[in-house]
Amino acid sequence: ELDYSENITIENVTFFGGGFNIRNSENITLKNCDFHYPSTNKFVLEEFQWFAQGNSGENKMSSFFNGKDNKIINCEFAYSNAPIYFGGDNVLVENCDFHNIEWDMNSNGGSGSVMIGGAGIFRYNTIFLSGNSEGLRLTETNATAEYNHLFDMGNLQHDGAGINVGTRSHYGTRLSHNWVHDCNR
C-alpha cells in the first residue's frame, strides 16, 4: 500500500497472493511485474462487502486511486477475483496481460475486468477469460484505448461489452484499432 507517495519504480517482481492499493500518488511505475491471485473475497471470514475502488473495508481490489502520471508497463495480472482499477489522471497501462478475472462476481454492475481513469492511455494490452460484464471500462473523460486484444469475456453476467465507455465518460475519449472477438455478449 502506498499513499501520497512520489517517484517510485517497482520492477521485475512477482507477487503471489498480494495486490496493490496505491492512492493519491504520482509517478509510480510498475514494470515487468507479475500479479498472481492479487485479490479474492473474504466470505469465509464473514466479510461480505463487494469489491469497489473506494472500498474502505477488508474486501479491496487492486487499485490506483486518484494520483497522476502513473505507469504500468509489461505486467501480468492473473487470477484476480476482483476488477483492477487504474484511476487518477494520465495513467499509462501498456503491453500488459489481464486474464482469469472475476470468477464469483463480487463487484458492482458497472465494473469491467480492467477500469481506466481520466486521460488514461490503455494500449497494446490483452484481456481474456473474465466473468464480469465488461472487459475494459473507461470510467472518466479523455481516455484512450488503442491496439488492444480482448476475447472470451462476460462469461458470468447477462449484459456488457468488450469495451464500455460510460455515458458520462465519452467526452474526449478515443477508441482505435482494438480487436474484440469471441465474447459471450
What are these model-derived regions, one by one?
Residues 1, 62-63, 72, 114:
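Intrinsic structural disorder
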Residues 56-63, 136, 149:
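Residue-level detector of functional hotspots within protein domains
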Residues 6-17, 26-39, 49-50, 66-81, ...:
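Right-handed parallel beta-helix
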Residues 19-21, 41-42, 61, 83-85, ...:
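Structural detector of coil-to-beta-strand junctions
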